[in-house]
Amino acid sequence: MARSLKKGPFVHYKLDKKVQENVESGKNSVVKTWSRASMITPDFVGQTIAVHNGRQFVPVYVTENMVGHKLGEFSPTRSFRGHAGAKNKGKK
């Protein structure tokens, strides 16, 4: 289910505060966050946000196309290494 429109988008208050400080000062420093559930708002465009994926921080440069999505969508948590194959598949 989608979030109710009357509630508005969720953005962690500390993340929002850090991004606003970057915008006001004109800096483009990387902001680290563990809040993967925070929604990307138009204020975030042009900022680089390092999103934690459980092991490390993945830098995400926010563009206009990302507005309305969640930060966690751009920081994959699983790495697919391929299915196990037969070792000597070609030999008979």
Curated annotation (Swiss-Prot):
Entry keyword set: Ribonucleoprotein, Ribosomal protein, RNA-binding, rRNA-binding
One GO term in the molecular function aspect is: structural constituent of ribosome
Q: Which GO terms describe its cellular component?
A: cytoplasm; small ribosomal subunit
Q: List, in alphabetical order, the GO biological process terms annotated in this UniProt record.
A: ribosomal small subunit assembly; translation
> Could you tell me which residues belong to the region Disordered?
72-92
Bias type Basic residues, positions: 80-92
**InterPro entries in alphabetical order:** Ribosomal_uS19, Ribosomal_uS19_bac-type, Ribosomal_uS19_CS, Ribosomal_uS19_SF
According to the lineage, what is the superkingdom?
Bacteria
Annotated family: Belongs to the universal ribosomal protein uS19 family.
State its role. Answer: Protein S19 forms a complex with S13 that binds strongly to the 16S ribosomal RNA.
Spell out the protein name for this chain: Small ribosomal subunit protein uS19
Task: Record the organism.
Answer: Flavobacterium johnsoniae (strain ATCC 17061 / DSM 2064 / JCM 8514 / BCRC 14874 / CCUG 350202 / NBRC 14942 / NCIMB 11054 / UW101)
Q: What is the lineage of its organism?
A: Bacteria, Pseudomonadati, Bacteroidota, Flavobacteriia, Flavobacteriales
